[in-house]
């Protein structure tokens, strides 16, 4: 949602200020398949295993989301 950096529904998220929905100082991310302990996972970390003829998807080191490989079946 606009103006929100993270999901502020739970005060238990150690990366997010539940009152403002903003990431805490030093946090890169609050959740996502490529977010680990408030930091982006390193480039090349598998975030989605291949299925069928598809290939594995990897974190890019710059976001918390898991980008689809360009050869997605």
Swiss-Prot record:
GO terms for molecular function: toxin activity. The keyword Protein biosynthesis does not apply. Expressed by the venom gland. GO terms for cellular component: extracellular region. The keyword Disulfide bond applies. Coiled coil: none annotated. A motif (Cell attachment site) lies at residues 51-53. Keywords: Cell adhesion impairing toxin, Disulfide bond, Hemostasis impairing toxin, Platelet aggregation inhibiting toxin, Secreted, Toxin. Residues 1-73 form the Disintegrin domain. Inhibits fibrinogen interaction with platelets. Acts by binding to the alpha-IIb/beta-3 receptor (ITGA2B/ITGB3) on the platelet surface and inhibits aggregation induced by ADP, thrombin, platelet-activating factor and collagen. PANTHER family: ADAM A DISINTEGRIN AND METALLOPROTEASE DOMAIN, ADAM METALLOPROTEASE. This is Disintegrin trigramin-beta-2. The lineage of its organism: Eukaryota, Metazoa, Chordata, Craniata, Vertebrata.
């Amino acid at each position: 949602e606009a103006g929100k950096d993270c999901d502020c529904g739970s005060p238990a998220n150690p990366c997010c200020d539940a009152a403002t929905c903003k990431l805490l100082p030093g946090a890169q991310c609050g959740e996502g398949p490529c977010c680990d302990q408030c930091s982006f996972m390193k480039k090349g970390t598998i975030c989605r295993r291949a299925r069928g003829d598809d290939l594995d998807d990897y974190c890019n080191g710059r976001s918390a989301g898991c980008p689809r490989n360009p050869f997605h079946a």
